[in-house]
Amino acid sequence: MSNGIVIIGSGFAARQLVKNIRKQDASIPLTLIAADSMDEYNKPDLSHVISQGQRADDLTRQTAGEFAEQFNLRLFPHTWVTDIDAEAHVVKSQNNQWQYDKLVLATGASAFVPPVPGRELMLTLNSQQEYRACETQLRDARRVLIVGGGLIGSELAMDFCRAGKMVTLIDNAASILASLMPPEVSSRLQHRLTEMGVHLLLKSQLQGLEKTNSGILATLDRQRSIEVDTVIAATGLRPETALARRAGLTINRGVCVDSYLQTSNADIYALGDCAEINGQVLPFLQPIQLSAMVLAKNLLGNNTPLKLPAMLVKIKTPELPLHLAGETQRQDLRWQINTERQGMVARGVDDADQLRAFVVSEDRMKEAFGLLKTLSM
């Protein structure tokens, strides 16, 4: 490979790929291009920065320069890729262009902001860069509205509450974590958040935001309103697909790839939050780690299909942490819930009494690995 591998992106997926490639080949040319600083940080830490009093710069684990030196890379930080010429094997920015033999899209996903009047007043916490832009506002805010009661929204609600702030969480659904599990399973965490002082506005809709002299007025349905100091959107992520679309690649929710992480173009691959693997978007650390291991082999000519095992998803709510696995969102499962003082084990079984999903909490999380072994895939 004379031009080597070009990777667009510098997040967790890109870094895992670099590490796996370098384990097998120390000299193949590797070029990374990204719009951010390319400094390394642990993205899940963003769910806990407020209660731990961390500044954005405190999150940095390794600078871009250290990363480049350690893994023999060419890095182009603060660089927006504008176009991909798939036929000519060229990646373009406004002032530069790069030839590639193989190209990897690791462009991640962006936070979805609900399209309501005043949406520009909402903050998002999807990167170190975003946190840096609003950390003073978040630290100084006394009244916080979190829009979205999913995984990130629930984590943030607990964190802001632990930091002593007045927290309101709003969601259209009738329970928190509604896209991940049924209400009878999430109710333990929901009750804990309420006990801590989080004001839950479920089955409720944000209709607009307006700046006032003393904060932000949030207008809700049913002629309700509340005033807060800051509003955070935690309503999910959208895979970044614009570049792939311009390159003529097949797009659905994400950039469509097969079991080899290959897109509809033989020399372009996708990895991480931007990728849709055989119809599934999997924005969690473990599938990204496993995908990076497989893709490194494929880029170096050792074709290997990705085979994902049953995997744990961790909800980092320290006052009541949860692990879950399997098809927890399936509507046809019967849930067998065992609740004790030290935690909960909820088993989701199908009509044949096969274990298809489970959720464990607190001290009973240690039972997760045993349950994983009996999970039917």
Swiss-Prot record:
Task: Show the InterPro entries listed in the entry.
Answer: FAD-bd_OxRdtase, FAD/NAD-bd_sf, FAD/NAD-binding_dom, NO_rdtase_NorW, Rbx-bd
Renumbered to this chain, the signal peptide range is none
Q: Pull one GO CC term from this UniProt entry.
A: cytoplasm
Q: Where mainly located?
A: cytoplasm
Write down the required cofactor(s).
Answer: FAD
Q: Enumerate the SUPFAM superfamilies for this protein.
A: FAD/NAD(P)-binding domain (SSF51905)
The UniProt record lists the keyword NAD:
yes
Name the chain's protein: Nitric oxide reductase FlRd-NAD(+) reductase
